[in-house]
Amino acid sequence: MVKIAIDMMGGDDAPGIVLEAVEKAVNDFKDLEIILFGDQNQYTLNHERIEFRHCSEKIEMEDEPVRAIKRKKDSSMVRMAEAVKNGEADGCVSAGNTGALMSAGLFIVGRIKGVARPALVVTLPTIDGKGFVFLDVGANADAKPEHLLQYAQLGNIYAKKIRGIQNPKVSLLNIGTEPAKGNTLTKKSYQLLKDDQSFNFDGNIEAKTLMEGNTDVVVTDGYTGNMVLKNIEGTAKSIGKMLKETFLGSLKNKLAALVLKKDLDTFTKKMDYAEYGGSVLLGLDGTVVKAHGGSNARAFYSAIRQAKIAGDEKIVDIMRETVGGKDE
């Protein structure tokens, strides 16, 4: 049995979409238990595998992260993180304030001993539909080569256990594919990744080929990763807007859109973040999943499923054994 703690109050459309996702999750997974934290006046479910705990406070999206974690002790997010810290839950899921959740993960759940810097990881879509694991996308703006090596080790485990890839290809994001390309960080990181025998290092990868499906794990520093992630998100939205404007531009185009509707739906689903769940803060002593703030019920359900798989696969235990315990 896997037990997941969930912040009922975080996200743009909470608690409605959270409750819908939780209800579907406990019905789909008979070996899943939920501890739900939130306002009892908005709790509407009744299920033997859902334990509800009332919280008198909520962390808002505009709250300063560290201050909110320290001052709002009875908030749904803080109480959720404490459940993981205390061993009551295997992992947690929230669609709330990203900075606050990262702070809760770092200061309440805590790092795995030996992990210097936790990394925020997402799974992004590719044109072949398989997707790739991308980290760090914003946990740490500054990174040393040793940090990128740990990201590669963590990402490799994540790709194996969460995505089911037997021997993941691990690549380093750079401005060229040649080993000598890049700045001091990427050059030194390249050598460290190349020398490590615990994963399948496939060399450098350029940003222009990320979506082609040539690799399984891409490693970079949080500053670069966050910019790349936002660029991909923005480009996808712009393409969607342009397609919509094109197909609605004339009667002929509207008819073409009807003919292509099935193909367009397939493309949209392939590129939809909801299919991949949330982002995960790797390197913590418990699974912490950040669902997108604008998640619908399907996306939040995917994030719960992601946390459950992490619990089933004992991913934190594996990271503790293989990456943790080393000198920082």
UniProtKB/Swiss-Prot annotation:
InterPro entries named among the record's database cross-references: FA_synthesis, Phospholipid_synth_PlsX-like
Biological or metabolic pathway of the protein: Lipid metabolism; phospholipid metabolism
Keyword terms, alphabetized: Cytoplasm, Lipid biosynthesis, Lipid metabolism, Phospholipid biosynthesis, Phospholipid metabolism, Transferase
Catalytic activities: a fatty acyl-[ACP] + phosphate = an acyl phosphate + holo-[ACP]
Location(s) in or outside the cell: Cytoplasm
UniProt GO cellular component terms: cytoplasm
GO annotation, biological process: fatty acid biosynthetic process; phospholipid biosynthetic process
Primary enzyme class: transferase
Domain of life assignment: Bacteria
GO molecular function terms noted in the UniProt entry: phosphate:acyl-[acyl carrier protein] acyltransferase activity
Record carries keyword Lipid metabolism: yes
Main location per the UniProt record: cytoplasm
Pfam families: FA_synthesis (PF02504)
EC number: 2.3.1.274
Quaternary structure (record): Homodimer. Probably interacts with PlsY.
Similarity annotation: Belongs to the PlsX family.
UniProt function note: Catalyzes the reversible formation of acyl-phosphate (acyl-PO(4)) from acyl-[acyl-carrier-protein] (acyl-ACP). This enzyme utilizes acyl-ACP as fatty acyl donor, but not acyl-CoA.
Protein's UniProt name: Phosphate acyltransferase
